[in-house]
């Protein structure tokens, strides 16, 4: 695991934190992971890949919700039904204990999908 990320599964904390390729700290809570699995149980074996999607995947900003980004990454192991994982991240700020505005970026959902390769 890369030094700039935390995998807290072994520590009993209900959150995974990674940094995207732009240096943004983003977290996925156990509650959100369970939300994803409620409607997409086939993703249960792909937590590491979902985190990798955020770390190294491409992203697109939502045109109507400018603080929402969709991260995409291709994974051959999802074939034949799907070939990409998608993670939706909300970028916000919150006040820390000193009253300073700090980033509060988090995953709200994710899914697998087939994206036709461009020719």
Where are these regions (language model features)?
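Ribonuclease/tRNase effector modules and their secretory precursors
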Residues: 1-119
